[in-house]
């Protein structure tokens, strides 16, 4: 069963939160962080992207860079830009994107739950990335940024969240860049704290949605500190790391699409012909558009030329609407691809995934792309950027073809994690991303 605890959060005063908060460290590069921070000395980028405190070109892995993160964390606290709460408490973090709100509980997750598999993962981690995050946690002696967890829907917790959502939040702002609304509440009532702890204790598992390297680093540093402490009791703060936990049904996973530089020596005609072995290939020259319905409420469809449909409804009307369907853009034309029966196994939580089908039968078998992490011929485009970005990169000549996929579901992720298997690379794109700087967890 999952163990969580409240903690004394370190966070900005209400009037400074929009100056401090930032995007997470791993969604932008050093130049972008430098530009976004500008002359704002209160920006969290000075802690999570500390290479911006040095001359451009300074390696983010330079020992001075890590020390700069620690120095700035101390400076932020000394200047009152970050203050630690007096009481151990939970927090609620809500994000609203396109009119849909998801509510997360900010908790201290138990390091041992990660080590024993109560906290379940679905991605492999790289040791070099783990070590980078471990160095950052060590020098700051804190989890500066949270990990993103999912948990099975829970009516008791949902009622508690909705009760707080009806009250005035501690923070409430529209973030730059993403344009989404972010709200934050403090849960200091002892009864509510006890309820949250008790409800999590009933859950057999928690699931890492996003932040596998941060989770691994936090857990490894916690275990490291326990080993180094001769008076270790198991109650120390380093036995926990900061996570924002959302109900699984509330989470939005967007499509994570592929663009490829070449056709592995094939002509376009040869490539399309090769696809017919495992897919039904449809040249999309017209589109059935669902209208509002007739007088009896029965849906009506109108067949429209593809250019007219795109002009009226936008490119995203072409997105794959069901599992095992794909959208190909090649030589200025759109094609629908539908996996034939027998090309996937519904009983296999990995083999049934569209990311696996496309990787096996298109990228590997036809295009010779065997390692999605390292092959320079392929790149990935998060669904928030839309099909327009796929079209742009192909039309520009940078890429030869684009492949759009139906998004993975949270249930599929949980099924894979429960089976102990690992998702294929570049399979999930969660949106909105957690903002950093709203809350920090110190390890002492």
Residue map of PLM features:
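Surface-exposed, charge/polar-rich loops and edge strands
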Residues: 1-444
């Amino acid at each position: 069963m999952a163990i969580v605890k409240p903690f004394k959060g370190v966070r900005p005063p209400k009037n400074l939160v929009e100056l401090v908060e930032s995007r997470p460290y791993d969604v932008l590069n050093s130049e972008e962080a430098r530009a976004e921070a500008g002359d704002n000395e209160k920006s969290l980028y000075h802690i999570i992207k500390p290479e911006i405190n040095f001359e451009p070109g300074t390696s983010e892995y330079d020992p001075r860079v890590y020390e700069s993160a620690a120095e700035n964390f101390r400076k932020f606290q000394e200047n009152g830009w970050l203050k630690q709460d007096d009481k151990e408490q939970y927090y609620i973090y809500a994000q609203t994107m396109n009119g849909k709100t998801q509510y997360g509980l900010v908790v201290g997750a138990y390091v041992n739950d990660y080590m024993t598999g109560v906290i379940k993962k679905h991605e492999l981690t790289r040791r070099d990335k783990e070590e980078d995050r471990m160095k950052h946690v060590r020098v700051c002696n804190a989890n500066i940024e949270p990990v993103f967890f999912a948990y099975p829907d829970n009516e008791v917790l949902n009622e508690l969240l909705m009760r707080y959502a009806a009250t005035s939040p501690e923070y409430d702002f529209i973030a730059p860049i993403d344009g989404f609304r972010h709200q934050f509440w403090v849960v200091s009532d002892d009864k509510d704290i006890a309820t949250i702890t008790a409800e999590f204790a009933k859950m057999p598992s928690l699931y890492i949605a996003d932040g596998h390297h941060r989770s691994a680093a936090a857990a490894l540093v916690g275990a490291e500190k326990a080993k180094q402490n001769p008076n270790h009791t198991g109650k120390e703060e380093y036995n926990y790391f900061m996570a924002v936990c959302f109900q699984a049904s509330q989470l939005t996973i967007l499509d994570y699409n592929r663009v490829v530089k070449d056709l592995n020596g094939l002509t376009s005609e040869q490539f399309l012909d090769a696809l017919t072995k495992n897919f039904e290939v449809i040249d999309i020259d017209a589109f059935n558009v669902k209208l509002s319905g007739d007088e009896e409420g029965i849906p009506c469809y109108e067949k429209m030329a593809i250019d007219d449909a795109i002009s009226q409804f936008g490119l995203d009307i072409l997105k794959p609407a069901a599992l095992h369907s794909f959208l190909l853009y090649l030589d200025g034309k759109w094609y629908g691809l539908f996996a034939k029966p027998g090309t996937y196994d519904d009983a296999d939580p990995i083999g049934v995934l569209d990311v696996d089908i496309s990787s096996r039968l298109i990228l590997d078998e036809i295009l010779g792309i065997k390692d999605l992490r390292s092959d320079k011929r392929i790149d990935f485009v998060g669904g928030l950027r839309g099909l327009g970005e796929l079209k742009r990169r192909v039309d520009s000549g940078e890429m030869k073809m684009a492949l759009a996929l139906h998004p993975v579901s949270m249930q599929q992720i949980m099924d894979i994690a429960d089976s102990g298997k690992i998702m294929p690379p570049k399979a999930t794109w969660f949106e909105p991303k957690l903002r950093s700087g709203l809350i920090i967890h110190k390890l002492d």
